[in-house]
């Protein structure tokens, strides 16, 4: 736009009505995208001025960002995270039974706090409770099925053109025809089956045949961090999404692999139990698994032409 502004708009057609009926997770994902935009703007020498939910009557516009010219007010902590954006991936692989240094845990906690959220690493009985809640949610999903999951797990084809036909990238006649990438969870990123350990890795391949998929032992004492906020409204979800992405980018920069454990978050009767009743924190927005291991595979993303509209 001529006024150097960017509107972040939600695509409600891509929501998950069964796992995310309030669209809380959708807001978290958009918050993460907003943080990446802020990092990219800082890297390019602009200061992003952000307003969350700028129009109360427009639920689709989640944020407006105005790019201000370079000045002394640039946040020099954000720009170095730019190179971590393409490297941050979800790893569904085993992590080493190796502690995360306390100094690094404290650094990640500080990153969440700087974005207006809080983060806590789980230990002792609280870690065991959260693992049990996630396992219960996973068992329920195995029994009940997951209609949303079926929409987003990609088996076989990972690329298609705009007609939905399979495309072999090596045989494209027009190098400008990039086709349309099917985003989601492709088969090659599912990771191995877990035959031991307690790492809360979601098995997206349940009920599907994957003969070449190996089984491996996962960590027995996973490192889990909770992202939580004081309240539980759309603006809080956007704040938490930015905090989540900042934590993940810094973790990636520091050599940590990561994944999400959302199973219990998708069941209201279990989500409220995730919080620690002793320190009485606010609602949990995300459970993050961190550790030392493979970063995971690169996965397709929505085509830029399908997600970005430039207005005069």
How would you label these PLM feature ranges?
Residues 1-312:
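Acidic, surface-exposed loops and disordered segments
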